[in-house]
Each structure stands twice: as structure tokens, then as C-alpha cells.
């Protein structure tokens, strides 16, 4: 137990790892505490403290770190709000001695953005449209359409009502491309009735076609082969024999002559090869 012989004369106030008992602080009276030394690097806090033992906050001198003075500028204890004039003076107005260093240090004087209160100070008044400031009223007035006099408004209303009163064009339901073949197969009386109905009431659907029977077509074609133009007596005879009206027989012969004329023109064009002939 010789390693503990040197520790037998101490008191029991401080514990040492090498001894089984405590040592009095009088043994270390010559050593100063490390807490009594002052701070070699004072730190600045942005808030004020009410504790009596804390020293008052003092400004910390930054040596142009990052060449951005506005970024590292000390503002002391931040108040709850800033007056707009003070903010503009501090953020936008740089000291005169800093102007010469702009070219060398590239200080972003113009690129620095102020606080919303500064912006509200510059554009504190709102223009006509309620959004942009008064400086933009000249553009707002230029973009507004010129007011129309009441006389022109009345004339415009009259012309608009006239255009609305114009009825749409009547579109005829019969197909224009229907050749003489369809005309020959349809009764002459009903064709005329369809034309009159379509001109009078274009909204109504076309009446269903009632074609001639094969017997009627055969007898009419036979008569047309011998006589292209039929007289009134023969027309009345055919109408009684085929159970048709005199008008139906007359219109059928008209359509058949148009069909024959078209067929002759097509034959001539086919053999001559001249489309203008």
C-alpha cells in the first residue's frame, strides 16, 4: 500500500483518481481557475439581456468579410418594427466613402433588395386600377378603349338587330347530282310535289319516293323508243293504261329526254376525247 502513503496527509474535500480519499483545496491555492480568465474572442449577441452579470452588447468589427457590408452590417438589438424612413436610409443609401470601393470590391449596391417596408415607401400610393402605383396610370389610360358615343351605340344596336333578323339561306334537300335515271324511275307528279314542298317548307323532311313499277317503266320506255315527244292523246291513253295521271306521264317523258341527252353527250365525249366539245 505504498502508493497511497503520499496521500494520507490531505483533507477530504476533493476527490482524486489516484487516491482513496479527498484532498483539501488549500493544496491547490497557487493555481488559478480557468473560469476567471476573460474571453479572448468576444461574441456579439443580437439580443439584449436583463441579467446583471452579463456585460452590455458591443459592436463586433467585421473586416469586410465576403465584401458584402450590407449582409454583415450590425444592427444592434433588433426592435419590433422599423420606420420606413430609417429602413430606406440604412438599406438603400450607402455612405459616400463606400462609393469609391465599388469598382474594386464589387459591392452590390444596386442589387441589394430592401425590406417590404422600403418598397411600400417607394410606391406608397396606389393608382387607378388598385394594384399598380400612380406611375403606371399613363399606361393604364392608354390601354383603355375609347368610349363610343351614344349615337354610335344606337346605330350599332340597329345594325346588330338587322343582322339577327336576316333568315338563314334555304338549303334544298334534293340532291343535285341525281341524274336522269332517278328522274325517270320516279313518278312525275310526286317529283313536282317534292319541289313545291321543299321550296315552301324546307324544314320538313323529304317525302319518301314511290318508284314506278317494272311494268310501268317497260311500257313507258317502249313508247319513248318510238316517240320521243308524245302528244296529248297518247299521253292520256298511257295514263289510263298504266293507272297514272296525265302529269306523271308528261314529267316522266321530260326526265327521260334529259337523260337521253346526257347519255348522248357522254358517248360523244368518250369517243372524241374532247371534254369541251
UniProtKB/Swiss-Prot annotation:
A single Gene Ontology CC term: nucleoplasm
Residue ranges of DNA binding: 205-264
GO MF entries: DNA-binding transcription factor activity, RNA polymerase II-specific; RNA polymerase II cis-regulatory region sequence-specific DNA binding
PROSITE patterns, per the entry: HOMEOBOX_1, HOMEOBOX_2
Major localization listed first in the record, in broad terms: nucleus
Annotated segments matching region Disordered: 143-209
Biased composition (Basic and acidic residues): 172-184
UniProt superkingdom: Eukaryota
Subcellular location: Nucleus
Pfam families: DUF3528, Homeodomain
Keywords: Developmental protein, DNA-binding, Homeobox, Nucleus, Transcription, Transcription regulation
The protein's role, per its UniProt record: Sequence-specific transcription factor which is part of a developmental regulatory system that provides cells with specific positional identities on the anterior-posterior axis.
InterPro entries linked to this entry: DUF3528, HD, HD_metazoa, Homeobox_CS, Homeodomain-like_sf
Name listed for the protein in its UniProt record: Homeobox protein Hox-D11
PANTHER family: HOMEOBOX PROTEIN HOX-A11-RELATED, HOMEOBOX PROTEIN HOX-D11
Family: Belongs to the Abd-B homeobox family.
